[in-house]
Amino acid sequence: MRLSHFRQADTRFATFLIVSLCALGLLAASPLAAEAQSAGTSAPPSTAAAVTAPEPSIYDRVWRFAEWYRDGSNPVVQRVLFTGRYQQDFAVVGADQGDLNEWNVRRLRLGPRVTMFQKWTVHAEVELNPQERDPFYVRFTDAYVQWAPSTRAAVTVGKQSVPFTMEGATSSKELLAIDRSNLANNMWFPQEYMPGVSVSGRKAPWVYRAGVYSAGAANREFGEFNGGLFTLGVVGYDFAKALGVKEALLSGNYVYQHTDVHNTLTRRLEHVGSVNFKLDTNRWGLRADLSAADGAPGQSGLWGVMAMPFFNLTNAFQVVGRYTFLNSADPNGVLLATYENRVVRGRGDRYNEGYVGANYYFYGQRLKLQTGVQFARMRDEANDGGTYSGAAWTSGLRIGW
């Protein structure tokens, strides 16, 4: 691999990192300045007041822009939120097969979320691409109505996320690594949002989800409804209380897809099974996934494993490691990950990846910087353009509201 390519990108990456850190550092410093000024002009609050009504941080005040309306006494509309995310990447790839160096607005989504009649939610978000004029409007992601009479059951109808596999079930706002692993890229459905009907809920320590979705041809709204259907079943049990930790969720996921040539919202997989585990002790934790899939015509069956430990050095600084392995039964069954795929378009049959990264949280998952280096190798037994050996360095700003 040509690691000299990383040195060529140092200036641009340093600029991105310095500008981001300075801008966010000013925000982080603002509460201290405000507190110092307040301390010099007013008497300190009583202990009781400090406990019951802590002063909101600058981040709390800034993020209030997302709450447009709230009135719990209104019998019709109780809350209106402006939801969304902005995610900016700087990616460098240096591989034996070629190089890549780019800025990328990875995700820009926004829309309203309205709570009505106490138990109903209407949510819609669109994805935009500010880097190009055509198409600036990419698609609807969420467009659904949900009825949730309690935490034990919620019925959702419309275009919604389809959460299975460890990282496929994790919002891009909450990923520990800067991007999902190649296991999710190959065995989850990266379109993520599909039209369908689902029922989900939690009755501690159990969680569950069941849904039926359209897998037809994709378009920017709800799809063409001209292909097959697929079903999803999820059952999980949280061992947190038994282990004395924050979270220890063991989940089983199963997807069955009626394969059809028009199914472009999904991967060409008939059966997908995943057993995944999420452990969080507050100080350290682990994400793990063992998944397997039967291919539809034109796609080999494959299986994979992913393990991702993390350690919280402080309340704001976190280090993450990850190992991913994928293997397909036949040649050309494995795709490369997002930025690697822009260097090598071909497929292979065995993939290994190691990742080391760090995250700095300014305001929890709502405002953070992430960076990570991955070293990956793909074998191409067919020798038809899928071989890959290289390193990728991706850093990014993540904002969610």
Where do the protein language model's features map onto the residues?
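Bacterial N-terminal signal peptides
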Residues: A14-A29
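N-terminal secretory signal peptides that target proteins for export/translocation
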Residues: M1-R12
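Generic detector of N-terminal low-structure segments
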Residues: Q8, T15-I18, M306
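Short, well-ordered amphipathic alpha-helices
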Residues: R64-E67, T231-F239, Y355-N359, G396-R398
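Outer membrane beta-barrel
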Residues: E67-A218, G227-L232, G236-A242, L249, ...
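Outer-membrane beta-barrel pore domains
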Residues: V51-P56, G94-G98, F117, P135, ...
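Active-site-proximal beta-alpha loop/turn segments in soluble metabolic enzymes
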Residues: G211-E224, V255-H262
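N-terminal periplasmic/intermembrane-space "pro-region" immediately following the signal or transit peptide
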Residues: R2-L3, L26-Q87, W401
